[in-house]
């Protein structure tokens, strides 16, 4: 458990010479605070940092955050079930949804399988990304077990008109184009953006994969491709200094095609539309806001055997969520936040089999209603801060399953409606006895993850494995306690260390159950108890006005504490991670950001089989750019590399490999 670890580019928001320059964060408490002034363990990536990073999507900019591991099994060639974010050991295995993803404060996880499709939003629409490590169900409800990722979109400019365009080209015929335009007219402002990312010719299947061997002659490596299109629109109207209305909508399309020499075969496609609105009013005594969001997703997955398309599995997911929040002060000591929230989701999926008469259809509906209360108590002129909070959640789900060989007279099973409730408390303490020289933090929180509709009523076939649902699943529960210290001996140097332990029960996992009809059967079950013990540390140093040094590290043990695999690790969760690097930015010279990240062993199943373990590799990246400013416009050519390694192949899992040594050249311009 003890690797010192250095601080990442992902948290460069903490790299400021003056404390007054620290960014504002809102996710930890739903109220505005400067970074480092909350009891929670928070990191931020700002817009300025994103523009300096060698990144293609949101996943890439979180790669070097402390306590955060990006399991990008197939990079931008992969789906959201293959590309995951793991926070404090949660979120890495094949059961999704232990890390909650928000957009502008509202959940954006799909109703069926509780994942966020990382390809649905372009980096050009992102203002900043806030990551809260540790349980957050006391504010946000289900799924906030390991932490919360809040993607905050860019607000339109308040005056004038601005436009930026960019393009880059690199290995595997990877090509990205993007556009962002914003303007303001009196009290009204707007922003529009669009992006395209294409790549062609990379084989995501490892050379050692049995499936690769059996299909080697049929593999269409020259034509396997991915295409990702994004578009977004933001509108804002400011009524006066105390009230405003903002609307943000986005559309995206992702396709991964051409893997085999099979006509009409699409490995995976995902089409998404989302729209959110927020009405805010400061009444003086009370600051209030109402937010609502709708997400609509359609996906399709094709399966194949050698040269034959064997099945297709289209799915449709719809989600509506809302939140009404109020913040008010009571005297000089108390700042209360009270609110109500809710969500509704619907999921429908089917599987059509072309080599048999079999047909499956499944789906369901879910409803969640909740209320939350939090008090930020400031004592002794802010030297002691205590933040208690609690949230009540009620949820109900109902579903159906049809699995038959008789399409004419199908046997459909309707499951009775089930409901559950959960109280989620938290308590945070921050002690600052010496004006930010040394700050002590400690947090206790309880969290939960309600079984998804896919867990309860779904299931799927992926390759040679068939995953079955279980309508009797219980919610996952966890309790976490952490203790941390922030040391700021000078304005240029900051050190943060946090240790934590999580006790979880009724963890859901896919348990192997032998074979059926030629498939490896895996059924979702509650495996009872899990503990995760870990430490995360980061350090950054502002050497001078232009040079910043950073490093971070994480070590943890995610352990199964009951059942047949007692004492073994949770699978697909790296147990060690370290990142280090620097940013040099001189307005008259150039900007260079470079970093390297090491991942330790990644167990592939619950048996701790070392023969099939992955991990133990370094990956580097850099971006070098130079900006030229002219009277009415600017130009910034750049070169960048991603996935730099000396290895022939990099794998997070046995079944996937990532594109490596990706070299890009590009140009951005603004006017």
Positions of PLM-derived features:
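Outer-membrane beta-barrel signature, preferentially recognizing the C-terminal barrel domain
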Residues: 264-282, 315-317, 364-368, 413-424, ...
